[in-house]
Amino acid sequence: MGTASSLVSPTGGEVIEDTYGAGGGEACEIPVEVKPKARLLRSSFRRGAGAGPGSLPRAAGGGGLLGASFKSTGSSVPELEYAAAEFERLKKEYEIFRVSKNQELLSMGRREAKLDTENKRLRAELQALQKTYQKILREKEGALEAKYQAMERAVTFEHDRDRVKRQFKIFRETKENEIQDLLRAKRELESKLQRLQAQGIQVFDPGESDSDDNCTDVTAAGTQCEYWASRALGSEHSIGSMIQLPQPFRGPEFAHSSIDVEGPFANINRDDWDAAVAGLLQATPLFSHSLWSHPVRCYLIYTDETQPEMELFLKDHSPKLKRMCETMGYFFLAVYFPLDVENQYLTVRKWEIEKSSLVILFLHSTLPSFLLEDCEEAFLQNPEGKPGLIYHRLEDGKVTCDSVQQFLDQVSNLGKTTKAKIIEHSGDPAEGVCKIYVGVEKIIKQDILGLENTDVEEKDGGREDSTPEEDDFGDVLWDIHDEQEQMEAFQQTSSSAHELGFEKYYQRLDDLVVAPAPIPPLLVSGGPGSGKSLLLSKWIQLQQKHFPNTLILSHFVGRPMSTSSESSLIIKRLTLKLMQHFWAVSALTLDPAKLLEEFPHWLEKLSARHQGSIIIIIDSIDQVQQVEKHMKWLIDPLPVNVRVIVSVNVETCPTAWRLWPTLHLDPLSPKDAISIITAECYSMDVRLSREQEKMLEQHCRPATTRHALYVTLFSKMMACAGRGGNVAETLHQCLQCQDTVSLYKLVLHHVRESMPSDRDKEWMTQILCLINVSHNGVSESELMELYPEMSWLSLTSIVHSLHKMHLLTYSCGLLRFQHLQAWETVRLQYLEDPALVSSYREKLISYFASQLSQDRVTWRSADELPWLFQQQGSKQKLHSCLLNLLVAQNLYKRGHFAELLSYWQFVGKDKGAMATEYFESLKQYENSEGEENMLCLADLYETLGRFLKDLGLLSQAVVPLQRSLEIRETALDPDHPRVAQSLHQLAGVYVQWKKFGDAEQLYKQALEISENAYGADHPHAARELEALATLYHKQNKYEQAEHFRKKSVIIRQQATRRKGSLYGFALLRRRALQLEELTLGKDKPENARTLNELGVLYFLQNNLETAEQFLKRSLEMRERVLGPDHPDCAQSLNNLAALCNEKKQYEKAEELYERALDIRRRALAPDHPSLAYTVKHLAILYKKTGKVDKAVPLYELAVEIRQKSFGPKHPSVATALVNLAVLHSQMKKHSEALPLYERALKIYEDSLGRMHPRVGETLKNLAVLSYEEGNFEKAAELYKRAMEIKEAETSLLGGKAPSRQSSSGDTFLFKTTHSPNVFLPQGQS
């Protein structure tokens, strides 16, 4: 077939020359491609056909494939046939291929058409969707725009509403301020009138309205009317150094100079008593620190001879005293030192004697000289009158040395001026120590804790008062430890001797008080340690001194996360302070949110009735967590007479508060800072050189070195350096410290280096760390149990050194850091490692957990253990601790409801889970036996019920309260007072649940039990009456509510407040003890007056027997010193008569009143208020005892006195005329009573108006008189007019028409034979 040396180009049909020459070789394989092959064959045949027979062959390079082939090989038929066959085959294949491809093209065309159709459809759908989307998007935008517009309108409306509310409140308070100004002007005019009349100038003002104690005041609708009966006791104004009572004008009894009246407790009314309690609560700094020291601190002094007795006392009896004090919530410390022959610890011993509340001396035959000085200071030089106990062991044949006998004689010669008691014993030492224990127990109960009459009263009553102590507070949960802490904080902050540069700040604070309302709170700002607390405490003292009518409520916040920084406890405490000034102590919710809502209402309520200003001071308020959330009431307009002052650090002040009026405390001037330091140095006989003074001046240029706390620490360091003799070195070290924390680090280093041993240094470090990681501090007794190997000498020396350098202080019996910078310094110095913090917390946890395992649940373990678990993040342990019902009970009963709730929230339990788990925990107590255990179980159920009630789980609260009721009825008696307590609590739940019918039944049952157990005039019965009054008021049954409220008030008037029902009575008791110490000298008028005041104080405590003793001693001393006809003797007689009247000894009271009246008639002017006072109460007594004939001339004399004092047309004269007319009506002398009634009616109508309630009362009395004379038509007319006045008053008061009684508390009821329902005449004061 020839070679394939040339090929046709597939693209151009050209021949491709063989590049390898003419040499033969194998033919190249043509690629199998249909189109090039067909083209190749067609062209070959065309060329072959064109040549035909006879045509010339082409050149070698230009022929086709066949030609070439033929040329090279010649023609061959088989090959031609083969080629034709190949051609046909290829042609068929081509046709097949073409047909298939055409079909594919048609199919693809159809698919393309279909896809185009689908594409168009999808495009149309997409366009429709896009249009829908655009429409929806436009609708959404429109809706959002509408929403934003609506929100803007809502915000605008809310702002407008708040603005209107604020404007209205401002308007209302402005008007109230105007009213207060008018009332203040009225009181000033009345005061001027009193002074003029005291000078003998008669001033007649017929337009003056009657202002007797029981004059009816028409108040706004819904205002609660309150009553207080007059107390017939008087005393001079020497108590005014502690209590200044407002003396509003109240008729002839207070018409003259206040110097001449009976005193602050004469004719005492409700407002005066509130002011007295406020004064007592504010007079805390007047009492010595030892009286307020929370631990019962016994300092033991012994000799070598009596050391066995001392050790026996510590071993056998000290634990019993400790348990007794723990039960009452106090610490007991028995402190003793080793015998200090060389007087190495003289300073520490003196400091311990000064702190102690009781000194016990164990004495035998000798008294070493180094102990004699301590004994003389403890027993002979005892200005505070602290109790002491001397145990003198006698022994046959052994002579007591002269020093011992002389000391005992000196103590004995002091007599009643000392409270030292000597116990002489000659038998078995164990018996002598037992006598010491009995004496110490009695001193603790009577002299230290003020429980002097508890046992006596129980014996006298013939029954045991088993009502728990906290029930004396009613439904109010009061924490005495929190109050104690605040009192001590105020004492400590106000005890500084240096207050340079504060005068300008005092003036700014004074301007705030007198500034016109409304005014936002004043912000006192400054750097750490700038003296904010000192400024506020000193200013409080000045306010109490110069403005005794100002009520000041203060709270000093401690370090962060302590109890004093809990916002809910702050609000609760301030609310309780406000509630103390109201007669009925109502239930107080413990829900933090509700407390925050109710506090402004209580504040507004008190401001409306308080005559002076109310100032609320919160120091370091920025230490309160989430302060802006929990103190929202600060941003609202305050009542007119309320001012608020808060102090903050500049760095931590909330941003929203920075717009308030601000008083910024600048650092001390360099001159003042240097003067304080040099003065302290001079006091220690340290003289700085001129060069050292220049260095000090240069050091005091920066502001951080002139803060008050920094300067104080600097001066203390220099004073200590003077005692140590290293002034230059200490000065150099102090000059390196540029802020308070760095100076505290230096102080800490110096104190540590001053410790006598490495062991003491280690103890000091551990004590500081334990105090730092604790919740509220650590007590000395707890430290002694944590470190048994530590002696009292070591502990006292460490505490004394730290206390002296302003590192530690005492608060509520606990050791705490004196300043926040001291706490921060210890944290930076020793506790930067979290593992160390955790280890110290675990040490405290182990200690308090061991107490729980021994069933010793005290307020300390309840305060510390849950908090420590929370800080450690131990949820399981905290959960187990909370399920200890005694811990939960302790927290709840002290009002720490919010704290308890936060622990449960930390554990992750809701309200329902709490209730369920507490119910499960109570099941383990159900099998307890014995009355004591059953009563404990009942108390736990009651606490749980009250807790659930405060949570709002009323249906679940009913179950435990009913269970508590069942247990008490079973274990005690159905008529026991504790059963009444359960009924009262259960009824309270039903009231909150709106089940008034059930509540009414329970309250009435509790009232019946209380009256049977205590008597109808006991405060427990008054509490049930108040609850019933509140219940009826909620049901709009105003007449029944008024009836029960009146009965309750009468009981309160007769009994005053029972001892212990207010925390202020502890102050009264201790004030009484101090006054008693002042009366033990010679007979002097001052001592007689003090004895009279003591009688008044004990009378206010309802301790009538003791009051009678002091009043009798006052009378006897005055008769000896002043003579029996002196007016002061009349005062004592008058007070004794009032006391006998209270005891229902009417004959004795009558005799005393007559003697007092006789003296005052001879000694005083005819219109003197003291004479009018005696005349009034003697006339009331005559009337009460049925001696009407004797009462008539006294009532006539009262009319004359009032006419001389006020003029013939004064309403007070009309009141006296009505009382005289009522008396004549009782005697059936209608002709003499009628003109008196008519004259009184004319005076009332002219001065008070024709629709005044006093006019209505007089009309009613005239109607009675006309009825008894048979003139029924006139009686009906008068009675109709009286009822019209009463109805008008009732509608004005919203359906609550207050009752009106005479000042004597009497309402005269006449029964006639004409009708059993005849209206009754009324007397007036």
UniProtKB/Swiss-Prot annotation:
TPR repeats lie at residues 467-500, 881-914, 916-937, 938-971, 980-1013, 1022-1055, 1088-1121, 1130-1163, 1172-1205, 1214-1247, 1256-1289. A lipid is attached at G2 (N-myristoyl glycine). Residues 1-20, 1293-1325 are annotated as: Disordered. InterPro entries: NPHP3-like_N (IPR056884), NPHP3_ab_dom (IPR056886), NPHP3_hel (IPR056883), P-loop_NTPase (IPR027417), TPR-like_helical_dom_sf (IPR011990), TPR_NPHP3 (IPR056885), TPR_rpt (IPR019734). Its main location: other. It is found in: Cell projection, Cilium. Keywords: Cell projection, Cilium, Coiled coil, Disease variant, Lipoprotein, Myristate, Repeat, TPR repeat, Wnt signaling pathway. GO terms for cellular component: ciliary base; ciliary inversin compartment; cilium. Residues 1299-1325 have a biased composition (Polar residues). GO terms for biological process: atrial septum development; cilium assembly; convergent extension involved in gastrulation; determination of intestine left/right asymmetry; determination of left/right symmetry; determination of liver left/right asymmetry; determination of pancreatic left/right asymmetry; determination of stomach left/right asymmetry. Residues 107-203 form a coiled coil. The keyword Nucleotide-binding does not apply. Required for normal ciliary development and function. Inhibits disheveled-1-induced canonical Wnt-signaling activity and may also play a role in the control of non-canonical Wnt signaling that regulates planar cell polarity. Probably acts as a molecular switch between different Wnt signaling pathways. Required for proper convergent extension cell movements. It is linked to Defects in Nphp3 may be the cause of polycystic kidney disease (pcy). Pcy is a recessive disorder causing chronic renal failure. The Pcy phenotype can be slowed by diet modification such as protein restriction, administration of soy-based proteins, administration of methylprednisolone or treatment with V2R antagonist. In contrast administration of bicarbonate/citrate has no effect. Interacts with NPHP1 and INVS/NPHP2. Interacts (when myristoylated) with UNC119 and UNC119B; interaction is required for localization to cilium. Interacts with CEP164. Component of a complex containing at least ANKS6, INVS, NEK8 and NPHP3. ANKS6 may organize complex assembly by linking INVS and NPHP3 to NEK8 and INVS may target the complex to the proximal ciliary axoneme. This is Nephrocystin-3. It comes from Mus musculus (Mouse).
